[in-house]
Amino acid sequence: MQSSSEHISDVLIIGSGAAGLSLALRLAPHCKVTVLSKGPLNEGATFYAQGGIAAVFDETDSISSHVDDTLIAGAGLCDKEAVEFIASNARSCVQWLIDQGVLFDTETSANGEERYHLTREGGHSHRRILHTADATGKEVETTLVGKASNHPNISVKERCNAVDLITSNKIGLAGTKRVVGAYVWNRELEKVETFRAKAVVLATGGAAKVYQYTTNPDISSGDGIAMAWRAGCRVANLEFNQFHPTCLFHPQARNFLLTEALRGEGAYLKRPDGSRFMLDFDPRGELAPRDIVARAIDHEMKRLGADCMYLDISHKPTDFVMQHFPMIYEKLLSLGIDLTKEAIPIVPAAHYTCGGVMVDQHGRTDLDGLYAIGEVSYTGLHGANRMASNSLLECLVYGWSAAEDILTRLPTAKLAKHLPDWDESRVDNSDERVVIQHNWHELRLFMWDYVGIVRTTKRLERALRRINTLQQEIDEYYANFRISNNLLELRNLVQVAELIVRCAMERKESRGLHYTLDYPDQIENPQPTILHP
């Protein structure tokens, strides 16, 4: 019998960004799909993506060039097979997006033909970024949300946080261990509900909220990585956290990202005295990969004792800047900064989680019936450093690939007959919520200071000791008090913080986004860092 707080579908998708919604739309003609969104439907990282989507649309470009650029940016740790798989399926997946109604910017060629306007970003040897001005993510997410919201086979649940996955062995079912559903905190009703499904997909995004400064929306708390780990899945390469080099330094807009496309179109990075510095660090200057640019900015800030560096595109024509970057122009103007006339104060900020839950080419994890797609996953695409505009692409390709696999397996997949309700009989309401707030701030501050852009073994050891103490406090709190949104996110962030530090301690070299003063050189024949539960 189905209880009032139980929901049943063929496929449960946890997350409502480009990965989750593209998968839902591909599945929906064939089965019943439930999509969980932590906040409003369009609140994920996809909505805020400014840059674009990398795909070969220019006849002078090639898939092999896209592959080579990605391998170079990944600093020797990309899985070449995964890179080739994604690059070779890029155009068809972008075309699917266009067919859904996404409008990318176009231009008129010299012979009068209309074609897509392609921009170039750091690490790319060709112009291959399709974009919608400087708000590509907003266009993609708005289109997918509109389609999903109106599809009769897609049920969307907003303001719902997954608490944990339910596995067959935990409820006494015989046979191979598999995922059978999830417990979900309904923030509107303030109660935990049960979701049953034949397949569960994690499309929960990354874990950048583990750091004090981040470009990500508030919901990026590593939920999927933590839940998969607790359910018995391996994770990989979590030491590689990308810090976006150019986040606006302003008290009223702490997580506003300034797209790489600004540098792609000629913006300079400058010291407070107006002098350029990137050519001192890399011959590619402002177009060097993000890890090099972020470290250079961090180095100059520390060397000069400066609060920030500056990004300057004021030497470009005003019309050009306003046409290409209208959203950024308006946002900065509202803060009293004129992009066309002055340099913008910037700092690096946590931006993207390159590692994640280990998956195969269809997004399958170690747990039967459980998939992970998008930023939550480790596919091997990004290696030690993600190249600009490859992330939305990965979401789309794995949304397609996972859908193919799920639809093949659904006819023989079994739905669990009954799942136990969430048990709150032995917990009370908390009278110490200040504990959560304190631990939250402490975690994000020491992760920024000790596990940030530049690391040392002592800093990592210090962070791990703090994490162990926090975990004990949070586990005790979780066992004794009713859950809340902040408690759920903190529990997951502390778990992911531990995994990040453990991965970082295992890598005895500096490579890509992982830079440690104790091991400044690269080793030969590097391997992914894989942790087993």
Curated annotation (Swiss-Prot):
A cellular component term, taken from the record's GO annotations: cytoplasm
Active-site residues, as the UniProt record annotates them: 290
Keyword Nucleotide-binding attributed: yes
Gene Ontology BP annotations: 'de novo' NAD biosynthetic process from L-aspartate
Entry EC number(s): 1.4.3.16
Cofactor list: FAD
Enzyme class: oxidoreductase
Alphabetic keyword roster: Cytoplasm, FAD, Flavoprotein, Nucleotide-binding, Oxidoreductase, Pyridine nucleotide biosynthesis
Main localization, broad class: cytoplasm
InterPro entries on file: FAD-dep_OxRdtase_2_FAD-bd, FAD/NAD-bd_sf, Fum_R/Succ_DH_flav-like_C_sf, Fum_Rdtase/Succ_DH_flav-like_C, NadB, Succ_DH/fumarate_Rdtase_cat_sf
Keyword Nucleotide-binding: yes
Localization annotation: Cytoplasm
Pathway entry: Cofactor biosynthesis; NAD(+) biosynthesis; iminoaspartate from L-aspartate (oxidase route): step 1/1
Function: Catalyzes the oxidation of L-aspartate to iminoaspartate, the first step in the de novo biosynthesis of NAD(+).
Name of the protein: L-aspartate oxidase
